Amino acid sequence: HTNIGPISAQPMAIVDSLDRAILTVLRDSGRAPFVDIAKQVGVTERTVRTRMRRMEEAGVIRGYTIREAGIGLTALVRLKVGPGAEIGTLAGEFAGWEGIECVYEISGDADLVAVVHVDDTVALRVLLEKMWHAAPPGEISTTQTELVLEQY
């Protein structure tokens, strides 16, 4: 356990391909029953229970939020809209997209912030490009993306 300033570095749990398959099902299906997860990944229900208990104890699964397993990332995408842009229309469109949990209209330098969950930085880049291309020219003036490092 090494302390680096106010952040405590913890060793990352070892997650194999079966664990990743289970995590993928959980990410897509929330709290799917063990039997359904077992069918989808091709193992017994008991194996799924054992693996999930181990991942819970290791902190990979916490409150049924997947964290620090090398699967997925969460980002906050702040958008500043151009003059005359319909903030509600833009927010409503983005809010319905896969990978976007929600979109808030906010005060401050930005007008909107989208809470985004994607597999990796490549998927994040694709989503950002999709946002820019979906908006009519001039509707988005800038974006600023912040990666979430930890959820408490």
Pin down the residues of each PLM region:
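A compositional/biophysical signature of low hydrophobicity enriched in polar/charged and small residues
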Residues: H1-Y152
